[in-house]
Amino acid sequence: MAGHDIKYGKHRTRRSFSRIKEVIGLPNLIEVQTLSYKNFLDEGLANVFKEMFPIDNFAGTMELEFVGYEMKTPKYTVEEARAHDANYSAPIYVTFRLVNKETGELKTQEVFFGDFPLMTEMGTFINNGSERLIVSQLVRSPGSYFHLKTDKNGLESFGHTTIPNRGAWFELDTDAKGIGYVRIDRTRKLTFTTMLRALGFGSDDEILELLGETQLLTDTIAKDVHKNPADTRVEEALKDIYDRLRPGEPKTADSSRGLLVARFFDPKRYDFAPVGRYKFNKKLALKNRLLGLTLAEPIVDPETGEILVNTDTLVTRDVLDLIEPLLDNGLGNFVVEPSDDAVIPEPITLQSIKVYSPKDSERVVTLLSNGNPDSECRVLTPADVISNISYWLGLAEGIGKVDDIDHLGNRRIRSVGELLQNQVRIGLSRMERVIRERMSSSENENITPQGLINIRPVTASIKEFFGSSQLSQFMDQHNPLSELSHKRRFSALGPGGISRDRASYEVRDVHYTHYGRMCPIETPEGPNIGLINNLSSYAKVNEYGFIMSPYRRVDRVNGIVTDEVEYLTADEEDNYTVAQANSPLTDDSRFANETVMARHTGNNIEVEASTADYMDVSPKQVIAVAAACIPFLENDDSNRALMGANMQRQAVPLIDPHAPWIGTGMEHQTARDSGAALLAKHAGVVEYVDGNEIRVRRTSGELDIYNITKYRRSNSGTSYNQRPLARLGEKVEKNDIIADGPSMENGEMALGQNPLVAYMTWEGYNFEDAVIMSERLIKDDVYTSIAIEEYESETRDTKLGPEEITREIPNVGDEALKNLDESGIIRIGAEVKDGDLLVGKVTPKGETDPTPEERLLRAIFGEKAREVRDTSLRVPHGGGGIVHDVRVFTRENGDELPSGVNKLVRVFIAQKRKIHVGDKMAGRHGNKGVVSNIVPVEDMPYLPDGTPIDIMLNPLGVPSRMNIGQVMELHLGMAARTLGIHIATPVFDGASDEDIWDTVKEAGMAADAKTVLYDGRTGEPFDNRISVGVMYMIKLHHMVDDKLHARSVGPYSLVTQQPLGGKAQFGGQRFGEMEVWALEAYGAANVLQEILTYKSDDVIGRTRAYEAIVKGERIPKPGLPESFRVLVKELQSLGLDMKVFDADRNVLDLRELDEDEVMTRPDNTEITPEMLEAQEAIVAQAEAEEEALINADIEK
């Protein structure tokens, strides 16, 4: 027997064909959301307050300090927030201290700071009763970047950009003449030496001494001449910079100093964030530039004075390991004193080392670094500017390397915690201005922290973020996998990201650093391709937001691959050689072969086993969770794998789902981490189980009660239903699944079913990927799902009085009211059809003032019945089903309703959707199709033992699509079902051809795994043997019930009077210009005229046509289309004199052609009001007769 058994959870064992030992399990799959939010609550929120406070008044006499904050218990639980359309949030109270510096008086006060959104255990937020989540964002990391540019003449030059988290950009560039320029915040450029002079290095000699002599530097100095002898070089430079930043304003050296400080050196205006400082120091550190260079000075141990490395030594990896600790401890540090009139006249600490230029071995180049400032330093420093210029000058000498912005070392994830932190910062900075103004304008004696603080900017900022940000999304709740995928998704779009229209091919493309960090498969098809991505299955995000991938460390001394796992970021991984996960190992964890396939900076190379530094932990670390659920993914073309991964997320939860016979081993953890299953919070013993709750007695003696969710409407309109899995008396551990969620079976994800599939054609019904299906799948409810739709009706106060929910509805018979209760609301369990009443509601009509006679009669006989109109809620087209739940919200019950609303009624209608022709089906390999025919079981082809086939697929769908995985799944699935075993075949480490044939043989199937099929209609065998097996097939959310639509009489557009379009508006089908051309080509003049008049926007004509049809008369000639009048009016509004003439050249007045003016019958006699009444009576009679006939049929 090939393979070995592995237990997944408590309820499923699978035979696994994996050969590679997995050293670590998958991490918690939603920790990217939960950890980020936890860090925000623990540290991030307090950090924002500490950044913003204390706040002083303008005079400096008062100060408002932040002391601390406390979150109180939430008003609603998660379930209550859902039911009440509320937010799941907790009130936050912040303690402030107001210090009066003149008197020393302290006032401490706790201030309510609004309700703060809380994350549920599943990583989502409840906002206005609906479940939303914050998608992480992939953005450029702040830092120092260098790039190579080629101009149109083919000349190469280097550029530099300093990107902060917040603040002005600083750029360096070279022109065609070889002069270097600096550009501050995208303004006009000026020579880069001007910036150095402004920092306090006024003379040419000082600059040359600092940076060393290079061609670019000497050429630029020659261009940068002293223009105004009245100013020092430093002052002149400062004024030049001011002139670029504020052209036209009077300039002084002092104002320029203030401006430069505000742009780059002021923490309020400029912020690198810790990640920016980390990236900056890493880029500019000398140790990262020295490898491969020759030293032009000896390296001396500062403590002993011993020469460790001599001059003219080539820096190898070993030499670098020797001098790296010394560089980190300040070797080569020196201090320069800028002139007194510099921007910041303080000593500047730099670090230097001299090397020979790779382009000219005689020339010495001085490399400068910024002295590695502390991570607390979050502004640009003069040392940073000088080091940047030094690095940039060095690039022309072949020292240092340019950056690739698409490298994942230069792009980082902004998760929910950081995004929320930014919103709070925006709110607080708006609040800061208000506080300062109030401090300065108020009387000092009576002022309190509460009086200074207005929390509206903060609450508005958070509310706006959750309500309308591009990154705050309505959660995809089709099934557990779509939930999980949505939580692990990250987007390059959104505020601060890139725009869809300007995204280049490079940004969207797969990059070598995506390996083990970002899935190369799972991304949308269409305009967002490559901009929205998913986290790979083992990936984690570090404190700076960089994605890390795990690797097993190789002990190179002993040649052993250890079980010690290290998480590396993309730029750390570039320094190492990483062996593939499928490299064969001996029993004592050594490489079995002399050489191994490995990766180094994006190259796949064969290296000696002794040179590998790390080894992949698992073959599936490359791809995301959805792709890892596709068996035999390695045998599918990548385009089809992308479709397969994306379509699994569209699977509809079925009423009786089954886990796949052929899985990948990912099904259990995906189901557990998705949030759809019910997990035990503590270990214990199950004391009680029923359909609604499970009680678990903890080992400590306490009782945990778990409520099971039954048939709740999900965000996608599907049924969210949990079923108990735990049994009475069963022992459960923490995080065990005790109830299956939707699309789950026995603790595993179960998106579809395992039908018997044959690859064969049948009467052409599976042409173009169509699917032929057996009637058994309908009779046995194999692919039946439940759709739940929500309808609501509210009563408001109108000018004429309040609306009412009631049974007393004008002109509605008892038959229509039979399912309403005494208050006029439908009863739960009632079966309703299109147009049936759900909530009876009446609205007051406008009444004219009564005449004196009427007033007299009312006084004698009492008040007559009020005039009301029927505004009841009815079942829309295609919405019929069974009333599953009714919820009534009123203020008396303590529900929060919008102003003007007195009562809100919500009705949920459930529909049982059996599969039928037009529904979309798919396998897991991107093989999708539409059900084209449902064949009686007796007509389906059958196996020699009489078993009829369930589904027939077109064999031509396989070769051109190159998704051979489906064929392998088919054969192995048949063997698995025959043997009664579930199988796990992990991606890139699954069943080989030999394993499949061995299992087929074990199951006693034919050697070619094919079979003879017999035609169910004739009993004759088909000519050739046919591939038959078990394949996992899912029903997708694109159901024909949601799409099929036909209009009878419906609404019209106000302006053009043409029917609306679309199913939601009960609209018609557009007869567009191409269709008109077709009729014109056939000369079908009458049909064309009808379509352009009666059936479109001839208002009078359609009324007359209706009347003529009802009376059985000839249909009259059409009138003037409304859109023609609109066109005339539009032309007149442009000042063009448009007149309309009849056939005899008489001018027609369009107003006279209005319905009110002339309304004639076909014989040109005028229509009177009496005639219209008679017409209405005829119509009413015809409708009554029709209803009577229908009722008679029903009785029959």
From Swiss-Prot:
Reaction catalysed by this chain?
Answer: RNA(n) + a ribonucleoside 5'-triphosphate = RNA(n+1) + diphosphate
Pfam family name, one: RNA_pol_Rpb2_7
Keyword flag Transferase:
yes
**Top EC class of this enzyme:** transferase
Give the highest taxon in the source lineage.
Answer: Bacteria
* UniProt cross-references to InterPro entries, sorted A to Z: DNA-dir_RNA_pol_bsu_external_1, DNA-dir_RNA_pol_su2, DNA-dir_RNAP_su2_dom, DNA-dir_RNAP_su2_hyb_sf, RNA_pol_bsu_bac, RNA_pol_bsu_CS, RNA_pol_bsu_protrusion, RNA_pol_Rpb2_2
Q: Which family does it belong to?
A: Belongs to the RNA polymerase beta chain family.
- The protein's name: DNA-directed RNA polymerase subunit beta
Biological source species: Lactococcus lactis subsp. cremoris (strain SK11)
Q: What gene, per UniProt, encodes this protein?
A: rpoB
